[in-house]
Amino acid sequence: MDVHMVDQVLARYKCGSNTAVRFKLVQCHKDILDNGKEFHPSFSHQFFGDKSILTAMNISAFYSARYDLHLYYHGGSLLTYMGLKHDGEVNSKVVDGVQPDPVLSVIAEKYPAGCMTNLDEFIAKLPEEAKFMPMGELLHSYKCNDTEYEIYKADVTTPRLKDYHERLQTFLLFEKRKEAGDTHYSIVGYMTVYQYYAYPDKIRPRISQMLILPPFQKQGHGAQLLLTVDKFYVQDPQVLDITVEDPSYDFMRLRDYVDALRCRDLSVFSPENIRNGFSDRMVAQARKELKINKVQCRRVYEILRLRVTDLSNAEEYKSFRLGVKNRLNVPFQKEKADIEKLKVLLKPEEFSATATLQSTQERIQYLDQLYQELEEHYKKTIERIAAV
């Protein structure tokens, strides 16, 4: 069989891994039967490679066009079941001996705490798993849609955390429900924070990971978790400020909202002070009172400045735009200065081969695009603040 024909045959037995993988958080047998509890991963390339396309899942046979990989977690303990469902099999000889992807073993490697593969045995364990209780120190509780939620802090010294951390990771947010007089916990999300040294005698916590599971997203849990973590570190005099490791766009939106909400009540961020421009006093008070670093403080200032800016007043609006664009232009000015240094150090042919600098017109267009995107983001943040 030629390569083209093999590709045509294989195409029937491929599907995107984001579609094939199906998660469920379950508490009892009926949850396993409830398709409404199912959700898919947003990203799976960490498991299957950048293409995130699955082919065969069995050494001797390919499964037919539909196959589903089920990953069920007990909502509290995260006891895990992994299973495969498919419509039928195709002999691998049909595709000229092309070897299948070892999907089950690939996933199993990512679960050091292990997975169950017998569904009946998994179901039989659920009543015992219902006795799960969160570990660590209770920091905060709140209600959302008549359901109670609790946030716990745990670290490497916390009993039971090591095994649990292998299944998840550590500021832990749980849903708390009562059924038939019994309390049941279900994991909602988590945040991992590492502490680094800050010269000369301080600590700088760095938020490394944050996740709110899909069934609980868009309900305000992310803001509750971040506010709780911020409050925890604000009380520690050893903490200089809080940073974030490589934040995603969604996390930046959340952080901007939470920090703007916190800063708007500080005297230094009063409308009068905001209109006078960004100041060192803002940086100092935001760091002292809320552990917000200078870079984030500037973003918060811009959000609150736009909030008090009369967009129908041409001069006010222009002043705001220029202030933001000047900040956005700083990296370009630094790049220009670096290019000038290279021009002195390198030979003409070396310089022309290594140095690239946008034209003034290109830079202006790019800055304008950056500004428009940022203003739109700031406006959405302001709308969310107004809704509180």
Question: What label would you give each PLM region?
Answer:
Residues 210-215, 247:
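Hydrophobic adenine-recognition pocket in adenosine-nucleotide-binding enzymes
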Residues 200, 214, 219-220, 251:
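A broad, structure-centric signal for solvent-exposed, well-ordered loop/edge residues
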Residues 212, 218-231:
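Conserved acetyl-CoA-binding loop-helix of GNAT-fold acetyltransferases
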